[in-house]
Amino acid sequence: MNSLEYLIANPHILSDTTLTDALAALASSTNVENQDEEFDMEVNSDDEMKIDLSALINPSVFNALQLPIGTGRFPNPSPPRSSSGTNTPIRKTPGSRPDRGKFTILDNAEVAGPEEVLNVNFDSEILQRIFSDPKLGIQFLARYGLIPNTRVCRVQDCPKDQLMSLIKHANGFVWRCRSCRKRREKRIITKISVYEGTFLFYSRMPLNKFFIFMLNWCENPGLSITEYNRLMGENRLVEETIYNTIGFMRDIIQNWCDTIISSHVPIGGPHRVVEVVETLSTEQLSNKTRNRRTRHYTTRTVFISLADDKIKSVDFPLHNVNDLERALLECVQPGSIIVMRDSFMERFGQQEEISNALFNHYKVKSICDVWPDFNERERNKQYIKTEMNQVPNVNQEPYAYEYFFRRCFADKCFNHLLRVIRLLYQK
């Protein structure tokens, strides 16, 4: 088992006292050099960056309260240098000095596959411990593909595939191109954030608060802002921040539905139940440049095949039975059973009138009509809408894609959201 997964899977082995002592020991063991007047600090070796990942999560650290010596990544200390200097050359042999700088956060072999995050058991305490240390935090993000493990300089004058060095800056860890810095050309930015181009780039929240809120939102649909803050405890957030963060996660899910999971062929089929949901949706989604504080909504109609959890949508609302027929022919196979809320069905008329208008290609029913035919699993999925509808003004929120996501991933919803984020930002 990977050491990071061991920590998350076995939080009972850690106590607050041992965790604090281990973090203090690690903080005192790091070795950084002042590099220039900008307070940059080069990471001088691979072990320097990996010490948190391999040692902080190693149970032996908390048992012995000291780093293991002479094993794994912590070799035996070098023998003391001779003070006489008779056997020490004045100038080292050319090429004997190791390359300085760090071009990856982790070894590429330590970066997990997209599905491995699904095996982790997260809770608020684990996330708080991970992100309480900046170095361990970016190692966690790099391991699960939430930030790039390496960066290539995009400046035209740099050599092709020129890797950037990871350094510790006054504002945190950044990537810096040493070639650009050596040229000292004006108007060239030699440093970029480790979060640039990721979903965290526009965030102004501390990472511990951001991920703990994501976890609470995934596990508790339909809560009010007051209830979410009660779960957050000392990490409580202001109303605007909660609203923007929820909107951001819904945009991520909508983008995943539109670009990855949406069916390219009509869904449903003979005797299969397809649910119709009218919802708002966010326009002009963009992973790389969108500021999540600015949103413009449009109305969509979403079709969900309940048996196999497939989704398809049209970019127009349904005002009458002709619009319904047009949307069904585009998205749903003939012979399907179309279900919707009673209040939504009233827009098109009575059930028999609707079926006749559709030339009996589809059977139209309400949710109440088919409820006795649902098994317990499907009833639990339908109850997700009941929980989400407890939020005031729910009809003014783009919730249909969130409902579909929660249907698909009722278990470990937070883990699946992390996986979806990785898939989207690697495109």
Curated annotation (Swiss-Prot):
Function per UniProt: Putative transcription factor. Acts in a TGF-beta-like pathway during development of male-specific genital sensilla (simple sense organs), known as rays. Involved in production of reactive oxygen species (ROS), acting downstream of the TGF-beta-like dbl-1 signaling pathway. Involved in locomotory behavior.
Knockout-associated phenotype: RNAi-mediated knockdown causes abnormal male tail development. Abnormal fusion of structures in male-specific genital sensilla (simple sense organs) known as rays. Abnormal fusion of rays 6 and 7 enhanced in a sma-6 mutant background. Reduced fecundity in hermaphrodites. In response to nano-polystyrene, causes decreased locomotion behavior and increased reactive oxygen species (ROS) production. Intestine-specific RNAi-mediated knockdown causes increased ROS production and reduces expression of daf-16 and sod-3.
GO terms for cellular component: nucleus
Keyword Nucleus: yes
GO biological process, one term: nematode male tail tip morphogenesis
Annotated region (Disordered), positions in chain: 68-102
Organism annotation: Caenorhabditis elegans
Protein name as it appears in the record: Male abnormal protein mab-31
